[in-house]
Every structure is written in C-alpha cells, then in structure tokens.
Amino acid sequence: MSRVAKAPVVVPAGVDVKVNGQVITIKGKNGELTRTLNDAVEVKHADNALTFGPRDGYVDGWAQAGTARALLNSMVIGVTEGFTKKLQLVGVGYRAAVKGDVVNLALGFSHPVEHKLPAGITAECPTQTEIVLKGADKQVIGQVAADLRAYRRPEPYKGKGVRYADEVVRTKEAKKK
C-alpha cells in the first residue's frame, strides 16, 4: 500500500490550483502547468493543500494516487522555484553556445549540432563547456538534457562526451599488448 499518497501537497501562497475533474492546472510565478491524472485517483483541494486517494473499483488506486501526488508536488515546486539541470562537455574542441532558443554544439562532427529548445525551457552557458537548463516542468528539463547528452554520450575509455554535472563516468583500462 502506498504511503506517498497519504501525505498532502502543500500549496504555497501565490500558487493557483484548479481541479477540473481529472485535469489539474497549477499556475505560479514561473508559468502554468497542466496534467491529466489517471481515472483511479481522486484529488481534493482544500485549505491550501491537495489530498489524494483511490476511487472505488480500481485495483491500483493507491499506487496511482502515490504517482499523482509525486507528479503534482513536482509541478508545485516547478512553478514556484523551478528546476535546473547542468551538463558538461568533456573533450578537446567540444564547445557549446546558446543563441535565443537554440543550443549550438561543436562535438567533433563534421557539422555543428543545433538543438531547438521547447517552449518554457531556457539555456545558458556560463563557460564554453557547460550548459545550464532551467524551466518549470521537471520532465521536459530531463528530456532536453537527455537529448543533448545523446548527441555524444561519454565514452568509457577517455570519458569524452556530454555528461550530467553530477554523473560519474567509469573508465575502462586500455587493451594491453
């Protein structure tokens, strides 16, 4: 039985929550996020808190309620504080630059890689080998970071490639003669 769903999500001041059936809209200083929840979940909004529970007739009600609570908690954090994800480029000649909503990457290919950012996501490059992604939607930030990393994943011998800032790349020993 899920214990995650038993804890309510506290809605801070300045955050507007609208519950319309299974569609939840959360609006704050960083934007507006909308999510449609599973039919097995019942959401109640009262006293600046969201409470979750299962609907009758659904076997996986508590599991889905725990998932819904985690997703809506991330939405509340996103519209109040926002999320950041840092990437590092490791390798000779690997560079990054941001122009508007396009991230330009030089990753050792014969052509530069241009990645267009989705709406609601901003990027900045404090140095030529760092990318900082910011936004309100945790899932979209993670997906953009994974897409950028997929252009040149860290290889296991020298560790060259695009990696998350907190990622530890295990390197292999070179073949012995």
Swiss-Prot record:
Record GO terms (molecular function): rRNA binding; structural constituent of ribosome
Coiled-coil ranges (or none): none
Keywords assigned by UniProt, alphabetized: Ribonucleoprotein, Ribosomal protein, RNA-binding, rRNA-binding
Pfam family, one: Ribosomal_L6
Function: This protein binds to the 23S rRNA, and is important in its secondary structure. It is located near the subunit interface in the base of the L7/L12 stalk, and near the tRNA binding site of the peptidyltransferase center.
Protein name, UniProt field: Large ribosomal subunit protein uL6
Subunit structure: Part of the 50S ribosomal subunit.
Gene name, Swiss-Prot/TrEMBL: rplF
Organism listed in the record: Klebsiella pneumoniae (strain 342)
